[in-house]
Design a protein with these regions (language model features):
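N-terminal beta1-alpha1-beta2 module of alpha/beta enzyme domains
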Residues: 4-87
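Flexible, glycine-rich active-site loops centered on histidine and acidic residues
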Residues: 18-35, 96-122
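Generic structural signal for well-ordered secondary structure
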Residues: 67-71, 95, 102
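Glycine-rich, flexible loop/turn motifs
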Residues: 81, 90, 108
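Active-site nucleophile and cofactor-binding loops and adjacent substrate-binding regions
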Residues: 89-97
Length: 122
């Protein structure tokens, strides 16, 4: 890909530049956590239909407006609702989790959804 193509987004997309999205699962005013998680699934499906390579989920705790505290659970839910997009954690905060539990959870997810699960650590 030449320098000219790097400056042209349309050209870059046609050259298969991998794009990813980071989902915070923000709860909008008036929505429930369930609605927010359903929106996250719809967002991932839409990203997949547009050819995005990866869908990252952020981990946040003790925040009423963010519904992605149980990242591995949400990753499994979204991977099960999509077909090909990679799904991963945009930073599992290891000080908050026993490392063995994280390894087992993500190993299980990888077994269920081969070559589609990514583990980001923070």
């Amino acid at each position: 890909m030449g320098a000219r193509c790097l400056l042209d987004l349309e050209c870059a997309v046609t050259k298969s530049v991998p794009f990813s999205l980071l989902e915070l699962a923000s709860v909008r005013e008036g929505d429930t956590v369930g609605e927010t998680l359903a929106n996250s699934v719809a967002y991932a499906r839409h990203a997949e239909s547009l050819g995005f390579q990866r869908f990252w989920l952020a981990e946040h705790h003790n925040m009423q407006g963010i519904s992605s505290a149980a990242t591995s659970v949400l990753i499994g839910h979204i991977a099960g609702a999509t077909e090909s997009i990679r799904v991963g954690s945009g930073g599992v905060m290891l000080p908050n989790h026993p490392p063995l539990v994280i390894a087992e959870q993500f190993g299980t997810l990888e077994s269920l959804y081969p070559d589609r699960i990514d583990l980001g650590l923070g």
